[in-house]
């Protein structure tokens, strides 16, 4: 039986891979959707949480989106400490288009992964 951590890590990696594939296709909406889903999955894992915000910063830089760039720089500072202390807004999609403090509903398929076996 796979552990919750293994399943969570694999699903996070899949979402990141899908985001990269969307970027290569030039599908910015799908890229962001997969980055947001990766963010939801990454919140309990400090390293992956930070890496997801780095990817979101890259998204903002490629789009020359000043708001996203600034938002991700701020989130990069607080991502790891938030994970370590358990003080992160569960379900938050991580983009600068939403408050960094706002909890959000988690899609059912991601909730199943977060709940584990």
Regions picked out by a protein language model, each given a short descriptive name:
Residues 15, 49, 53-56:
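TPR repeat positional signature
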Residues 50, 58-67:
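Extended alpha-helical scaffolding segments
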Residues 1-36, 40-43, 63-117:
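N-terminal alpha-helical interaction modules that lie
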């Amino acid at each position: 039986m796979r552990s919750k951590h293994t399943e969570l890590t694999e699903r996070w990696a899949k979402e990141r891979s899908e985001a990269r594939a969307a970027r290569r296709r030039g599908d910015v909406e799908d890229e962001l959707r997969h980055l947001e889903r990766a963010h939801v999955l990454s919140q309990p894992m400090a390293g992956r949480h930070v890496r997801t915000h780095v990817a979101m910063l890259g998204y903002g830089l490629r789009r020359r989106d000043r708001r996203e760039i600034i938002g991700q720089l701020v989130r990069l500072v607080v991502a790891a400490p938030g994970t370590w202390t358990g003080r992160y807004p569960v379900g938050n999609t991580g983009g600068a288009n939403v408050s960094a403090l706002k909890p959000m509903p988690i899609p059912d398929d991601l909730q199943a992964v977060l709940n584990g076996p």
